[in-house]
Each structure stands twice: as structure tokens, then as C-alpha cells.
């Protein structure tokens, strides 16, 4: 159940009991249900959504189908990704930060995500990066397109078993940024059995060479 909080009072003291009432009602059904809290991160739900019975909570405004919007009122993929940087401690088994749906494969389709055709989508490299970043964040990987008509490039991204395995690792840790150096961002996600997933992400719009010292840079 996704529970939107449209046109509601801005204070958390009103929001929490409303969401908890629904959370309690869902538990009483005796059926396993996923409870998604959506108030767009305005009341810092990562601090209280678990106690309200939530399993995931939106951390930002709605995502748009553009890599970077450069518009404070229209959040692109990169704007949303950057807003997750201080939230890792709140994610874990049973409760997840939700940076919104995947835009992978939309290519400007969707009236809302494209803002009525204003945004034409991303290229394949950007979509691949988007999917990997959301996997590293331990975010819910919720597809936002008609899978019956997706092209091969989109299917190859969304069905990548190794990336999905990183996202679904049972430890449930959200990746943290180790450093950003000359437009290269390095993220570390702890996995069960002491393993690590490392993401070397080029934030720039040009190819770049980068060397990672596993002994020095990962500490």
C-alpha cells in the first residue's frame, strides 16, 4: 500500500498518528503487506516512519525523467541521488529510504515524469548508472515502464543479476560516499560475510581515467 499525504498539514505531529493508524490497520489484517509512506520527505520520515509501521518512505519530491534538471522545483536523477547522502544510517532490513521510481527505459515517455514532454529522458549510460546507484543505495527497485514493450538495452539493465544481488544483499546496508575527487565519486556498500561493493562513478559528462588504491582509498 502506497499512502500519499496530499494537501495535508505540514507538521509531523499530525502526520505520524495518521500514518500509524493505517500501519496498525494493515497489521490487523493478518496479511503480509508492504506499507510505503509518501509525504515526499518533507517531515523527515526516516526518523519516524518505521515506528508508524512503514517499510519504505519517500525521501524527496517526485523524480523526473532527466539526468539533471538544474531546477529546484523539478528533481532529476542526480538531484535525488545527492539528497540521499546523509540517510544511510536509517536504512536496513524492514525499512528503506525510497528515492522514488526507476526512470530506466522511459526515454521521455510518461506525462508526469517528462513534465508534459519537457524532458526527453536519458541515454543508456545514464540509465545504467541510475540503476547501479539505486542498487548501491539499497533502494526499492520499482520499475516505471511497461515491461512488455521495453527494448533490449533496457532489459539488460533491469535484469542484471549481479547488480540486483548487490541491492538485495541481506545485510541491507545503504552505500556511503568515501570521497569525490575530480568529478569521480567512490561509494562503498557493506555486504554480508564482510564483502564490499565498490562503485566508481563518473559524475562528469566526459570519459575519465581513475585509479583506485584498494588499500588506501577504502579505509
Give the residues covered by each predicted segment.
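Loop/turn elements at helix/coil->beta-strand transitions in domains of secreted/extracellular proteins
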Residues: 1, 28-34, 52-54, 193-196
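The substrate-binding groove and active-site-proximal loops of carbohydrate-active enzymes
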Residues: 1-13
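A cross-family glycoside hydrolase active-site/sugar-binding cleft signature
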Residues: 4, 36-38, 199
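Soluble non-cytosolic domains of exported or imported proteins
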Residues: 12-17, 126-127
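Alpha-helical scaffolding segments of alpha/beta enzyme cores, especially the outer helices
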Residues: 17-24, 28
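Glycan-recognition surfaces
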Residues: 34-145
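Catalytic cores of secreted or luminal carbohydrate-active enzymes
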Residues: 129-179
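Carbohydrate-binding surface patches
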Residues: 134-137, 142-144, 180-219
Amino acid at each position: 500500500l502506497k499512502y500519499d499525504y496530499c494537501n495535508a498539514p505540514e507538521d509531523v505531529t499530525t502526520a505520524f498518528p495518521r500514518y500509524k493508524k493505517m500501519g496498525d490497520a494493515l497489521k490487523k489484517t493478518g496479511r503480509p503487506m508492504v506499507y510505503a509512506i509518501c509525504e515526499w520527505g518533507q517531515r523527515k520520515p526516516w526518523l519516524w516512519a518505521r515506528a508508524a509501521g512503514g517499510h519504505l518512505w519517500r525521501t524527496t519530491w517526485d523524480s523526473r525523467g532527466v539526468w539533471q534538471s538544474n531546477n529546484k522545483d523539478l528533481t532529476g536523477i542526480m538531484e535525488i541521488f545527492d539528497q540521499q547522502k546523509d540517510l544511510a544510517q536509517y536504512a536496513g532490513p524492514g525499512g528503506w529510504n525510497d528515492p522514488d521510481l526507476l526512470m530506466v527505459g522511459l526515454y521521455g515517455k510518461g506525462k508526469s515524469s517528462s513534465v508534459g514532454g519537457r524532458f526527453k529522458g536519458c541515454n543508456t549510460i545514464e540509465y545504467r548508472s541510475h540503476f547501479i546507484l539505486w542498487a548501491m543505495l539499497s533502494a526499492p527497485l520499482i520499475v516505471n515502464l511497461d515491461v512488455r514493450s521495453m527494448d533490449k538495452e533496457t532489459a539488460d539493465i533491469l535484469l542484471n543479476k549481479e547488480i540486483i544481488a548487490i541491492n538485495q544483499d541481506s545485510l541491507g546496508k545503504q552505500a556511503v560516499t568515501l570521497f569525490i575527487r575530480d568529478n569521480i565519486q567512490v561509494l562503498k556498500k557493506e555486504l554480508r560475510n564482510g564483502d564490499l561493493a565498490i562503485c566508481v562513478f563518473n559524475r562528469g559528462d566526459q570519459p575519465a581515467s581513475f585509479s583506485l588504491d584498494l588499500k588506501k582509498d577504502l579505509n
